[in-house]
C-alpha cells in the first residue's frame, strides 16, 4: 500500500 506518493513504495510481490 502506497503512503500517498501516488506510487507504491515497493513492487507488488505475493507472499507464498
Curated annotation (Swiss-Prot):
Q: Return the GO cellular component terms, semicolon-separated.
A: extracellular region
- InterPro entries from the entry? Pyrokinin_CS
Residues where Leucine amide is found = 16
What family, per the record?
Answer: Belongs to the pyrokinin family.
The name under which this protein is listed is Locustapyrokinin-1
Which keywords are on file for this protein? Amidation, Neuropeptide, Pyrrolidone carboxylic acid, Secreted
PROSITE patterns (UniProt xref): PYROKININ
Q: Which GO terms describe its molecular function?
A: neuropeptide hormone activity
* Tagged with keyword Secreted: yes
Q: Which residues carry this modification: Pyrrolidone carboxylic acid?
A: 1
Q: Name one GO biological process term.
A: neuropeptide signaling pathway
Q: Where in the cell is it found?
A: Secreted
The entry's function note states: Mediates visceral muscle contractile activity (myotropic activity).
Amino acid at each position: 500500500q502506497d503512503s500517498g506518493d501516488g506510487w507504491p513504495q515497493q513492487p507488488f510481490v505475493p507472499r507464498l
